[in-house]
Amino acid sequence: MKTLLLTLVVVTIVCLDLGYTKTCLISPSSTPQTCPQGQDTCFLKALCDKLCPIRGPVIEQGCAATCPEFRSNYRSLLCCTTDNCNH
């Protein structure tokens, strides 16, 4: 009985310690990566500069604690909170 109780305690501690980690697509490779603790928002930014008409927007993907603030040089900004949603 003590062995069963000890096993249950160890399993509970291990499960609680693992926690949940968010994964987001990260530029430039657009591969899923685990976000740092506390960064539970995925984002995708399309940035434009003077070369935008020639080469198109620069795409940035990553993790953030909150959705980045929209700026004037952004063509678009997507924020989401499910795994790998920033594609």
Swiss-Prot record:
Expressed by the venom gland. InterPro entries: Snake_3FTx, Snake_toxin-like_sf, Snake_toxin_con_site, Toxin_cobra-type. Its main location: secreted. Pfam families: Toxin_cobra-type. Keywords: Acetylcholine receptor inhibiting toxin, Disulfide bond, Ion channel impairing toxin, Neurotoxin, Postsynaptic neurotoxin, Secreted, Signal, Toxin. The lineage of its organism: Eukaryota, Metazoa, Chordata, Craniata, Vertebrata. Residues 1-21 form the signal peptide. This is Kappa-5-bungarotoxin. It is found in: Secreted. CDD domains: TFP_snake_toxin (cd00206). GO terms for cellular component: extracellular region. The keyword Signal applies. GO terms for molecular function: acetylcholine receptor inhibitor activity; ion channel regulator activity; toxin activity. It comes from Bungarus multicinctus (Many-banded krait).
